[in-house]
Amino acid sequence: MTIRTHNFFLPTLLIFQMLFIFAMSSFGHTSSDAQSNLFVDFIAQNFPHVRHGLENNLISLSTLIFLVRKTAHFTEYAILGSLFFLNLRNWLKSNSTLTENSKLQTTKTLTRKTPNTQLTKAVAKKSLLNPIKYPLIMSISLSFLYACTDEIHQIFVPGRSAQFRDILIDTLGASFGATITYLIIKLFAKIETRSDK
């Protein structure tokens, strides 16, 4: 897949996922319950152990619905975190030449204006202020911010409310998705490096 295709395809997937989360949060309490019940029925029909637990009161229906909803939250944001990471990484790669030129110019400027004893600290500080160097951290941070706006959105949806617990679950899901994506890419990069030797 070419860089130009990546520049269109990945952002489109990211926007679609953000809109999907927004749409799911726009459902009222009744619609949300109906969706959860569909998943619960599917699980009960296809997993005998779960059905046995419900029939023998080993697990309550409300607990199962709660687990289904929170798993959905986790999964939605795992996908979002992964897409944020891929988009940030792609942006970084496509702008690598510009970034290197900028760093070179910054170093030259600091060399002229900053004593040698302070040059290393100044360059290090400049690097820390460049968040795109850290797509993993930024993808988790952006997912957290989106989770916050999602909970604020739910305040205005009938029957829904904002819960800090959901923000934590969403952020945990985003962290999982972004980290797994990062590790997979790193693993394939190592395999490719070894095969070239």
Language-model regions, residue ranges each:
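Membrane-interfacial alpha-helical segments at the cytosolic side of multi-pass membrane proteins
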Residues: 76-92, 172-188
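Alpha-helical transmembrane segments of integral membrane proteins
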Residues: 5-13, 134-138, 142, 165, ...
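Membrane-interfacial, low-structure loops and terminal tails that flank and connect transmembrane helices
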Residues: 92-133, 192-197
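Small-polar-interrupted transmembrane alpha-helices in polytopic inner-membrane proteins
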Residues: 16-21, 136-154
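Interfacial helix-loop-helix junctions of multi-pass membrane proteins
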Residues: 148-171
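"…centered on the first transmembrane helix and the immediately adjacent amphipathic helix/loop
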Residues: 2-86
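Membrane-interfacial segments
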Residues: 87-96, 153-157, 161, 184, ...
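Short, Lys/Arg-rich N-terminal segment immediately upstream of the first membrane anchor
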Residues: 1-7, 126-131
